[in-house]
Amino acid sequence: MARITVEDCLEKIPNRFQLVLAATYRARMLSQGHAARIESKNKPAVTALREIAAGKVGLEMLKKVPN
């Protein structure tokens, strides 16, 4: 199993704070039943980071956060 590192994700979302927000929101979506965009048997937080590192999810997650 390949390990996901913050550096892998920072290549896609350079700002650490935006990365955390995007990963958190995506993990919440996954835990509520949304379909994963990659094949994964991991917990929602790890799956969200894997999606970001793979380029399947990005800053568009922040535009979906309700005000």
Curated annotation (Swiss-Prot):
Pfam families, alphabetized: RNA_pol_Rpb6
Domain of life, per lineage: Bacteria
Any GO MF annotation of the entry: DNA-directed RNA polymerase activity
Gene3D superfamilies per record: 3.90.940.10
Keywords: DNA-directed RNA polymerase, Nucleotidyltransferase, Transcription, Transferase
Catalytic activity: RNA(n) + a ribonucleoside 5'-triphosphate = RNA(n+1) + diphosphate
UniProt keyword annotation of Nucleotidyltransferase present: yes
InterPro entries membership: DNA-dir_RNA_pol_omega, Pol_omega/Rpo6/RPB6, RPB6/omega-like_sf
CC terms in the record's Gene Ontology section: DNA-directed RNA polymerase complex
EC number, as in UniProt: 2.7.7.6
Any GO BP annotation: DNA-templated transcription
Subunit annotation: The RNAP catalytic core consists of 2 alpha, 1 beta, 1 beta' and 1 omega subunit. When a sigma factor is associated with the core the holoenzyme is formed, which can initiate transcription.
Protein task: Promotes RNA polymerase assembly. Latches the N- and C-terminal regions of the beta' subunit thereby facilitating its interaction with the beta and alpha subunits.
NCBIfam families from the UniProt entry: rpoZ
Family affiliation: Belongs to the RNA polymerase subunit omega family.
Protein name: DNA-directed RNA polymerase subunit omega
Protein species of origin: Polaromonas naphthalenivorans (strain CJ2)
Lineage: Bacteria, Pseudomonadati, Pseudomonadota, Betaproteobacteria, Burkholderiales
